[in-house]
């Protein structure tokens, strides 16, 4: 079983404009609403690949119920803890640029946190937990560490700062920093010459597998024995939201379904790229189209 954790989910409210002018009244050409949050994004791609992940986390108020209902309408399972305060709405403005306005999110009480930890009792050894995203301001900074300690499951972790190092001793199945984040973790500038070296440091510190996304330059995959680079695939960028989460979901799907690591990496690349070329999380047809174009080359060992 695969579980995803979204501690601070949102309605992602997307507004599309031809042109944005600060201080003016503007009518959007289109607007869309999706359940948002990194764990939810990973769940959606896993569902589109044929898995049945369970969404865990916190939702509250009418916004939270909209999120939960939207997830169920997609055919996804959810066991969110209901909290007193409202979940958040994040606004994403899309014109010739992309601007995101993310709300702070609700305060979560100690009693609500304990309910969440109780929900972890059903997770068994051999299950996989996808942990991603920043924590709400009211949760302790070691919240994710407690999740890991309370279960015997494999886990992936995708968080954007140096705190990632604190989780490597628990031997995560996958970590997925981008190039900029990798540099911040080790307080250095990453370039083509040292990219594999610093990705490998994450292996040496405990990560079983590492994917570093490089934007338009593609990505690399590193484990304890090999390093591979996926060439970038040409196409029109439609949506940057959820591409990284789709990569994580694709890799987890591959590992759960006993694919070779390199095939799991190829699927991760296909999922991330397909989502970037789609208005929402990519469907299976789009993933398959992109998968046929994925090329990887070994770049070291």
Q: Predicted segment positions?
A:
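Conserved phosphate-binding/catalytic region of the ribokinase-like
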Residues: 193-301
């Amino acid at each position: 079983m695969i579980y995803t954790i979204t501690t601070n989910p949102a309605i992602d409210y997307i507004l599309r404009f031809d042109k944005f002018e600060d201080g003016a009244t503007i009518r959007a050409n289109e607007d869309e609403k999706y359940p948002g949050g990194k764990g939810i994004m990973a769940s959606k791609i896993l569902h589109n690949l044929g898995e049945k992940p369970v969404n865990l986390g916190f939702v509250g108020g009418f916004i939270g119920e909209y999120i939960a209902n939207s997830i169920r309408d997609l055919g996804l399972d959810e066991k969110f803890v209901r909290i007193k305060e409202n979940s958040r709405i994040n606004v994403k403005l899309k014109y010739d640029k992309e601007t995101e306005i993310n709300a702070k999110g609700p305060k979560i009480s100690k009693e609500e946190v304990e309910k969440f930890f109780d929900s972890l009792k059903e997770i068994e050894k051999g299950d996989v937990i996808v942990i991603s995203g920043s924590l709400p301001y009211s949760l302790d900074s070691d919240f994710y560490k407690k999740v890991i300690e309370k279960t015997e499951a494999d886990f992936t972790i995708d968080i954007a700062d140096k705190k990632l190092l604190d989780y490597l001793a628990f031997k995560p199945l996958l970590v997925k920093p981008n190039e900029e984040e990798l540099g911040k973790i080790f307080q250095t500038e990453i370039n083509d010459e040292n990219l594999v070296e610093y990705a490998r440091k994450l292996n040496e510190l405990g990560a079983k597998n590492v994917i570093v996304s490089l934007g338009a330059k593609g990505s690399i995959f590193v484990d304890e024995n090999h390093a591979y680079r996926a060439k970038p695939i040409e196409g029109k960028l439609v949506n940057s939201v959820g591409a990284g989460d789709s990569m994580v979901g694709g890799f987890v799907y591959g590992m759960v379904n006993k694919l070779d690591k390199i095939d799991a990496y190829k699927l991760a690349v296909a999922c991330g790229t397909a989502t970037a070329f789609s208005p929402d999380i990519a469907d299976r047809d789009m993933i398959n189209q992109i998968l046929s174009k994925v090329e990887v080359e070994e770049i070291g060992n």
